[in-house]
Design a protein with these regions (language model features):
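N-terminal Rossmann-like NAD(P) cofactor-binding subdomain of oxidoreductases
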Residues: 1-198, 301, 325, 332-334
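Conserved active-site and cofactor/substrate-binding residues in soluble primary-metabolism enzymes
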Residues: 8, 39, 88, 104, ...
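Predominant activation on well-ordered alpha-helical scaffold segments within soluble catalytic domains
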Residues: 14, 18, 107, 158-165, ...
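Generic secondary-structure signature for well-ordered alpha-helical cores
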Residues: 22-26, 162-170, 180-183, 210, ...
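Short clusters of hydrophobic/aromatic residues that line enzyme substrate/ligand-binding pockets
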Residues: 65, 130-132, 146, 188, ...
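Short, solvent-exposed beta-strand edge segments and adjacent coil->beta transition regions
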Residues: 143-144, 200-202, 239-243, 306-308
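Acidic, glycine-rich segments within the central catalytic cores of soluble metabolic enzymes
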Residues: 166, 170-237
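C-terminal active-site/capping subdomain that shapes the small-molecule cofactor and substrate pocket
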Residues: 229, 241, 245-334
Length: 334
């Protein structure tokens, strides 16, 4: 029996998640809530500037989107507590507005009839934060109703760091994410509380903050306080890369580090972490569903235990693929 899903906020992540879910027989997207109308949302689902056209018939009629004949009810309700999740028999809500990121507000979906809520961002006081491949064993279906899927960068970094720490022990590290621009940046200069993010997204490299490195401690508690990082937003529409420099507990070789990633990608992290032997660039990873793709030719080492690792990630498709997988994971115990 498929998991019935409602999506609150049909922006970049909401729509890309829907694309991944439409391919999955175990998930049925039955409702979308967004302040835009059904015709506009259907158009944006069908035509995507980053991921191309959806290979399906997509239409809008009578307050609904139809994808190859499958109906997705569309509403435009501001208060999540008033959403028709009971009527639609929704099991899991994808909370992707970027607005309802704490337990108090996200729990309104539960009041509306949903069984579980997954917040598509780092959240304030969720029941649990899950990064698949890292700490899914922490999920307790009897206790946890509001989950965070962390961020795209945390999914990449935590997955990468776990391999290093498990194999060699991580003493401390610093991560720089070179990140594609996102919708919270303006096309032209425009006021923003972060003065650097106030600048035109497609013109400059923009240093800014990221909580991804410190958030690793939420899913790998033993590394709490051992990682920090920054972000540099760059003028590309999609695909990002984490540059991790870490001090290890014991001496290693480049071969040993790369072999650890090869082994993980072929084993316990298959489908979540991948490796790349070719000398590729960001556009080559557009549409890649992995949380982390380690760039093996770029691995570097100083004095035996200071290692540099580059890990690519499609910050839209890879992250949305983990959302899909998390919904399936939750669905097993509903």
């Amino acid at each position: 029996m498929s998991v019935r899903v409602g999506v609150n906020g049909f922006g970049r992540i909401g729509r890309v998640f829907a694309r991944t879910a439409l391919r999955d027989k175990d998930i049925e997207v039955v409702g979308v809530n967004d302040l835009a109308d059904a015709k506009t949302l259907a158009h944006l689902l069908k035509h995507d500037s980053v991921h191309g056209g959806l290979k399906a018939e997509v239409t809008a009629k009578d307050g609904a989107i139809f994808v190859d004949g499958r109906e997705i009810r569309v509403t435009a309700v501001k208060d999540p507590a008033s959403l028709p999740w009971t009527e639609l028999a929704v099991d899991v809500v994808i909370e992707s507005t970027g607005v309802f990121r704490d337990t108090a507000t996200a729990s309104k979906h539960l009041q509306a009839g949903a069984k579980k809520v997954v917040i598509t961002a780092p959240a304030k006081d969720p029941d649990v934060t899950i990064v698949l491949g890292v700490n899914e064993q922490a999920y307790d279906p009897k206790k946890h109703r509001i989950l965070s899927n962390a961020s795209c960068t945390t999914n990449c970094l935590a997955t990468t760091v776990k391999v290093i720490d498990d194999a060699f022990g991580l003493r401390r590290g610093f991560a720089t994410t070179v990140h594609a621009y996102t919708n919270d940046q303006p096309v032209h200069d425009f006021p923003h509380k972060d003065l650097r993010r106030a600048r035109a997204a497609a013109v400059s490299m923009i240093p800014t903050t990221t909580g991804a490195a410190t958030a690793v401690g939420l899913v790998l508690p033993k590394l709490k306080g051992k990682l920090d990082g920054i972000a540099i937003r760059v003028p590309t529409a999609n695909v990002s890369v984490v540059d991790l420099v870490a001090e290890l507990e014991k001496p290693v070789t480049i071969q040993a580090v790369n072999d650890a990633f090869r082994e993980a990608s072929a084993g316990r992290l298959r489908g979540i972490l991948d490796t790349c032997e070719e000398e590729l660039v960001s556009v080559d990873f557009n549409g890649n569903s992995h949380s982390s793709i380690v760039d093996l030719p770029s691995t570097a080492l100083i004095e035996g235990n200071l290692v540099k690792v580059l890990a690519w990630y499609d910050n839209e498709w890879g992250y949305s693929s983990r959302l899909r997988d998390l919904v399936r994971f939750i669905g097993k115990t509903l």
